[in-house]
Amino acid sequence: MKAAPFSYRRAQTLEEALLAGGENARFLAGGQSLLPMMNLRVTWADTVVDLSTLEELRRCRREGDRAFIGAGVTHAMIEDVRIDDPSRGYLPHVAAGIAYRSVRNRGTLGGSLVHADPAADWPTALLALGAEVAVKGAGGERRMPLAEFQRGLMETALEEGEILTGVSVPVLSSRARWSYLKFCRKSGEFAHSIAPMVCDPERGLGEAVLGAAADKPRRLPRLSALLAAGERPGGTELTQAADDDVQEVTGLERASYPFHLHRTMILRAWARLKELA
């Protein structure tokens, strides 16, 4: 199956891209999500605006105790640490597990976030890192927490004509600990469960998140509170917190296979976090 007819424009600057965007226009970065969906006619566009050559979308910089990563940075650039890593290995670890190398060479950080597939890596991993996103449109730039940007299944807070320009994440301290576990039935496919945890007392960061389980990645409130408080319970207290969190964010029956899968992934991620402590 092939995409419906559309016109193609390659933007030379971000301002040119913003002018070209409009009703029934789509922005193309790496094309690893948009093009397959257009070929399947799940989505369509009158105009496709190519952002792939815009160097300004690949720029990275420090902003105090946070780091800004351009939306055009590819998964492979993060995996190979061709940009500064503010996460003490967390982001390269996540990037290395995305699909296949050919996909990682083309796919971009921003493209994954805009696509907003709840089973994708970056929406879940960056939520656990306390990320904020920057978007730009005709009215200027605005920033918001990633949790607000992700509204639901393949739905974001982007307005018509806006472009995601980058992501801001905290620079983790030497006291930071993290774990990231993902379950796939075979290598390279989308996950059936993702369980990241990030804890950094110096940054006031303690987040446990569950991905590939609902309409969007969801914060696990009880486990996040335990991480933020520096508590490391085990046994019944831990399993009860995990069970209650999974049921709250998924609504699954406790006897079901998906519930057991998510619960197991969370407990393994917690155990891995303790090993790193």
Region roles according to the model:
Residues 1-277:
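C-terminal structural segment of proteins
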